[in-house]
């Protein structure tokens, strides 16, 4: 049996908004497994959390750069936010993004690419030596369309094209470039805000759909719904899930009376041609990286020779 710590209970509460005692019970029932505890709470009808939020602990910057029909987004991590505010580091992130725009989104290819007489990897090493803190190019992604454009949006930007979150969106169209760019930026801002799982239901991981369906079915059984009705009301619940989690079905943040899909269709008049959203990438700094929280009092005691 796993030891359930106060920190684990706190994390679960922050993720789900559920009371401390229910969070502790959920963790106890699931042997400390955070994701299983979230699912357990949802089956009990106590939590609306659709997925584990994950603690964002890494520092650094997201860089997003576009040029006509292609765009890239990169994540460069540092150890502290202090370094992320350093002009040399910010310049490094923009340089890495520009290189990725030329050579593609393979991290190893980016690191091996030449910038002047040196490689990107050497430039990162030089920055580490100068600034005195470890830095890593963690990931990169790119989008391209044959006709149309790739738009971008950077949230909490510290400089143009670099901040704590970056989004690129690919729109395929032969219409007016200025109207398409304005539309693309709005869609990118929507993606940053609403964090969709996929463009439409067909793009959602089947394992995620199955898990959601199982959670809904278990929840309805616990509510005493007749077994004959469960399949039907579960399918209805899945429609709600897709409306909340897929881009084209989400209510558009600039006009929530219509979906993103409807907003795209309505924009075709201004653009002057059909518009198809072919892809999006959303990077939030530190996604999936978990850094142990230090016990400040213990550190002070240890430094004083008391620990």
Swiss-Prot record:
The keyword Cytoplasm applies. GO terms for molecular function: translation elongation factor activity. The keyword Cytoplasm applies. It is found in: Cytoplasm. Keywords: Cytoplasm, Elongation factor, Protein biosynthesis. Transmembrane segments: none annotated. Residues 80-83 are annotated as: Involved in Mg(2+) ion dislocation from EF-Tu. Pfam families: EF_TS. One of its GO terms (cellular component) is cytoplasm. NCBIfam families: tsf. This is Elongation factor Ts. The gene is tsf.
